[in-house]
């Protein structure tokens, strides 16, 4: 029996698609809420339903790639702590299914591609997509995540251990 998943499945795991789906639901709801307010004359604008659909599709593609790429970069950075947690020890890098270099190249590439997709729509969307990727990688992953327990989330209370909290906690 081969427990080693295909490269495609490894890429999907690196992207943390379950988390990305939640982000995308929020994004699509925001687009729809905006356009419904426009149609109700609560705010100004004149986008058609076809343009709304286009905005949703661009957001789904670009947002999934950008967020998925930043998640892959996060896994590269967390490769030293992932083997020690039950929730993360089965990830592709700790299992040796993919190299750190390959994972980083994948993450950076799809982050840039995701942000580039927004160029089809508006330069401001490109800016905010890249800002989000950089914020997640540098501010959350590298700077904040290991410095405070207030950012720690876990699906199970048993995963919350004092070893993950700063000594001042």
PLM feature spans:
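The first (N-terminal) embedded transmembrane alpha-helix
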Residues: 16-32
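Short, Lys/Arg-rich, polar N-terminal cytosolic tail immediately upstream
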Residues: 1-9
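Membrane-embedded alpha-helical segments that form the functional core of polytopic membrane enzymes
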Residues: 33, 41-75, 111, 127, ...
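A short amphipathic helical element positioned immediately N-terminal to and/or at the very start
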Residues: 10-12, 93
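Conserved small/polar residues in nucleotide/adenosyl-binding loops
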Residues: 152-157
